[in-house]
Amino acid sequence: MQKTTFQDPDQQEELDRWQCKDFGSRYEDASTFVSNKTIFVVCGCGRSGTSLLRVMLDTHSLLVCGPESLLFLPLSIKPEELYKKFEVPLKDLRSWKRRCASRAEFALHFQEAYLALRERNIWGDKTSRNIHRLEQIWQHFPNAKIIHVVRDPRDVVRSLKTHRKRKVVDGQIVPTGWIQPLDDCIGRWLRAMDDALHFRGNSNYMEMKYEDLVLDTISTLTRVCRHVGVHFEEQMLEFHTVTSRSRDARLFPQNIEATQPISTASIGKWKEELMVEEVEEVVRRTHDYAIKLGYTL
């Protein structure tokens, strides 16, 4: 099959990330460093609702969960990017990168600093692609509470087709106009399920449906909070009223909607935006996993 050539080279880079082609073996953490601190990890296939859950949890008085840190992915640690997203002192970030013998140790220093900065008790990392790194996360943070956000694959694929919908150019959010190949969209969802569902049964792993989060918000957040080890707080429902660095849309331009009030408008949107033959292909390839997740296609 002839490879598609995209007008915007960033689009191919995005598709490569979906397949984790940017992961580098030299950035793998082969150390024996272990932290027994409780942390939580929000992850899942992109466009499943991880950012919405992230800002809700970040509104809890005891929890902190900022934009994607990428710290658990085998990528180069970039202090400047972390400073821009989290406002942890740049000199400290650079110092840890020089001194730490492992990225897990760096992550521990980072979480302690960010917790102190935000005056919270438990750090959470929301990076969608952590879904491909659960075993590695538990290797260094055995008490990590994994929250796997899942969603009807038809809606995920529908959303992935135009991802990334926006990018930041000269400090401004602008549309990309991208249309992604259906095969890549389905493949990304399947890859996430391949890498996560065999951890079912692990007491530190839970699944949460996006649909439950927006249709039965309090019960769903109560279950998530219990998994993390805290009580649900009513203020979590007011997540969209919070203004802070962690909610700056320029730091996560693909997920601007996550800072707005809860809406059910995206449920079933595939019916309007996917062609019949596309729906048939999505159902054919995702059916078995979807049934396991409790979806009827």
Enumerate the predicted regions with their spans:
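PAPS-dependent sulfotransferase catalytic core
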Residues: 1-108, 117
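PAPS-dependent sulfotransferases, especially Golgi type II membrane carbohydrate sulfotransferases
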Residues: 1-41, 161-165, 169-170, 178-179, ...
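Generic structural marker for isolated residues within well-ordered, non-membrane alpha-helices
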Residues: 54, 111, 134, 221, ...
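PAPS-dependent sulfotransferase catalytic domain
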Residues: 77-87, 117-237, 242-261
